[in-house]
Amino acid sequence: MTRLTLALDVMGGDFGPSVTVPAALQALNSNSQLTLLLVGNPDAITPLLAKADFEQRSRLQIIPAQSVIASDARPSQAIRASRGSSMRMALELVKEGRAQACVSAGNTGALMGLAKLLLKPLEGIERPALVTVLPHQQKGKTVVLDLGANVDCDSTMLVQFAIMGSVLAEEVVEIPNPRVALLNIGEEEVKGLDSIRDASAVLKTIPSINYIGYLEANELLTGKTDVLVCDGFTGNVTLKTMEGVVRMFLSLLKSQGEGKKRSWWLLLLKRWLQKSLTRRFSHLNPDQYNGACLLGLRGTVIKSHGAANQRAFAVAIEQAVQAVQRQVPQRIAARLESVYPAGFELLDGGKSGTLR
């Protein structure tokens, strides 16, 4: 394994350095080839490194940042006032080649805008998309995008997302000839928005995409598709609804029957069932798949949940490591070059999203 350097916006997210710095130390323990650049306020970071040993400190560097982009700031305002912020400086480290990827739990809109401004989209990509890999009930994985980077998406963008998601599923998740579906309100051809139906028509013409049609939201975790494509608004609502239900379910498994009097054998049975069911469904725990890759850029950017805990942020760091090792941007660029003549000639240069 070759050495990797990642830039962490340690000031972003709901909990800032109190979560991101311990997660950074956890990541260093797990990967001896990893070096981390901690971008943020040194006064907030340094005390949290007290438990770091000499070896860990040799693979850490604090990059001082003057400010933090607020989580509730409007993206346009945040971008204009971003100079000197921890998020922008972390992205600039990637742009300058000092880091191979950036991880941030900060403002999603600002991260999207700054990443597009500084790192630039790949040739043929109009706007990047947030993508994550979710587990499903068959113990496999499903690539889902967009998860909030683009609220409104035209047919061109949906087709581009499908291509990028297919590459990610094949190259990172290692699914041969991945099935691709569009999230819709029904499986019938006439259902859905014009943008979805137009994207469907184009995807059918691209030989390198294994397009299988529409999928409804209630089948997200069934394993019926390997890649699920949607606009950012729908994807974000779907993901957060699913995560809320899973967290509630796992919580109920742990608390069921607490405080009630039971015979000793019923208590033993209850505890056995709790442990058994918790193990059976633990792979659905949202903390285990935190970290959405901002796909379609010339560099690697990972967006962590703002409310991520230490374990979840460490998972986001690992997502960045995998994306760099698998050369995701380069592989997407290569696939786009091969796909353009076959399918994108039907689109207006990847700009307008209208069929010719």
From Swiss-Prot:
Q: What is its EC number?
A: 2.3.1.274
Care to name a GO molecular-function term for this sequence?
A: phosphate:acyl-[acyl carrier protein] acyltransferase activity
Subcellular location(s): the record lists: Cytoplasm
What keyword terms does UniProt attach to this protein? Cytoplasm, Lipid biosynthesis, Lipid metabolism, Phospholipid biosynthesis, Phospholipid metabolism, Transferase
Name the GO cellular-component terms.
cytoplasm
For this entry, list what GO says about its biological process.
Answer: fatty acid biosynthetic process; phospholipid biosynthetic process
Organism's domain of life?
A: Bacteria
Look up the record and name the pathway of this protein. Lipid metabolism; phospholipid metabolism
Cross-referenced InterPro entries, in alphabetical order?
Answer: FA_synthesis, Phospholipid_synth_PlsX-like
Xref: Pfam families: FA_synthesis
Q: Where is it mostly found?
A: cytoplasm
Catalytic reaction list: a fatty acyl-[ACP] + phosphate = an acyl phosphate + holo-[ACP]
Q: Which sequence ranges form a coiled-coil region, renumbered to this chain?
A: none
SUPFAM superfamilies cross-referenced by the UniProt entry: Isocitrate/Isopropylmalate dehydrogenase-like
What function does this protein fulfil? Catalyzes the reversible formation of acyl-phosphate (acyl-PO(4)) from acyl-[acyl-carrier-protein] (acyl-ACP). This enzyme utilizes acyl-ACP as fatty acyl donor, but not acyl-CoA.
Q: Which NCBIfam families match?
A: plsX (TIGR00182)
* Similarity comment: family membership: Belongs to the PlsX family.
Q: How does it assemble?
A: Homodimer. Probably interacts with PlsY.
Task: Indicate what this protein is called per its UniProt record.
Answer: Phosphate acyltransferase
Annotated source species:
Shigella flexneri serotype 5b (strain 8401)
Record lineage: Bacteria, Pseudomonadati, Pseudomonadota, Gammaproteobacteria, Enterobacterales
